[in-house]
Amino acid sequence: MVTRKMDKRLWSLQGMTALVTGAASGIGYAIVEELAGFGAKIHICDISKTLLNQSLSEWENKGFQVSGSVCDVTSHPEREKLMQTVSSIFDGKLNILVNNVGVLRGKPTTEYVADDFTFHISTNLEAAYHFCQLSHPLLKASGYGSIVFLSSVAGVVSLIDCGSIYGLTKGALNQLARNLACEWAKDGIRANAVAPNVVKTAQSQSFLEDVSKKEGLLSRTPLGRVGEPNEVSSLVVFLCLPAASYITGQTICVDGGLTVNGFSYQPHA
């Protein structure tokens, strides 16, 4: 019989540490709120100093243990500096790495230029890959490590409006989660990916304001609506909890049923 004491341990992040990238707004912000609610001590980074300071102030008023750094994740030196800061704050140990930061420039494939490719790869994929490398010794030292990648349904099925480069970066994150789950299991580190459908954030606002695009998306989504940030953050944080200790290498869609709903692509003549 499982005791109440054991139940609390399984559903608590008390005493654990976390790094969440791009977390001053949107889904990242919701992830921080959820992690803090379970007792984690968190460090975040964001490229916007204004948003970072605003969010840190809000969390301080709520009594959350959150610190933050301004960081351009496309910069190799800035990524290294961030991890040095994290190591110093958390005494060389880290339990949770959430690779949340991501960008999207949706275009037809023939219209992409070299800068678009570099922009997506460096932000969505290279940064996440490098953060995993840098955090490995800290995650291993903690004795309980969990990596969560914020992927997308665009990395699972073809979503033309998101663009091919965005889709390939998210698909790569799903595969990276599988590889790390196998390679780093011996070090006590799990890795999973969470793949949301379109979620109500500032980043998705222009898409949702396009009536035809929004209607097209909702017609393929069984639940008939877009997601909320907290509907994604709840799964992200679950994957970090001891209760999820046997889950690794998975890509889990938070999509209102989009990826299991059959639909046909009809190209324009």
From Swiss-Prot:
InterPro entries: NAD(P)-bd_dom_sf, SDR_fam, TR
Binding sites annotated in the UniProt record for substrate: S152
Chain positions recorded as NADP(+) binding sites: 19-43
Keyword tags: NADP, Oxidoreductase
Pfam families: adh_short_C2
GO MF terms held by the record: oxidoreductase activity
Family: Belongs to the short-chain dehydrogenases/reductases (SDR) family. SDR65C subfamily.
The name this protein goes by in its record: Tropinone reductase homolog At2g29320
Organism expressing this protein natively: Arabidopsis thaliana
